[in-house]
């Protein structure tokens, strides 16, 4: 493993409620190892996969582990560095792994960034289903942030988090078979995640 991991992740509880407010989960997961694949509309998303399954290990950017203080909490929360080999190994051990296929945060709260193929490749190599997850926040900024880069948008959101502390609904979709052409399955995964957006559901 790229970084040591603790046997049982301890998901953050107080911090998400402080940053987000009320949390609600809709849907259930199948038993056994799965790859959770979620949209990435806020830096706060990283705390939410543990609400879907407490033992889930989230793949995060290596930069997170470069800060000693942050690394301490990242390990406690079950975060691991992004690595296809490590993710596959964890899944084959029977653990649940989580990933945001866009990699970057979609600061507008809209599905505008493409999914990378890593999620499908991980699920295929591990032989586990992918489970689409959608994070729907109670309030999110409008198009007024579009003139700014995604980095600046996220700085704005970080500074204004009390204003956007309106709760979140975590919507869990049906498991997906990863078998098939990687690019096509990646498109299908993105469509499945996007379809969970409340406005699009029937």
Q: How should these model regions be labeled?
A:
Residues 33-35, 96-100, 131:
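Residue-level preference for the first positions of well-ordered beta-strands
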Residues 17-25, 78-82, 151-155:
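Short gly/ser/thr-rich secondary-structure transition/capping motifs
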Residues 73-75, 98, 145-149:
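Short low-complexity, flexible loop/linker segments enriched in glycine and/or proline
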Residues 90-120:
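Catalytic-site beta-strand/loop segments enriched in glycine and acidic/polar residues
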Residues 1, 108-117, 184-202:
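Soluble, non-transmembrane catalytic domains of enzymes that act on hydrophobic metabolites at membranes
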Residues 28-86, 109, 141-142:
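Catalytic core of membrane glycerolipid acyltransferases/transacylases, capturing the structured
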Residues 111-181:
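A cross-family acyltransferase "interaction/gating" segment
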Residues 6-40:
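Helix-to-loop junction immediately C-terminal to a conserved catalytic motif
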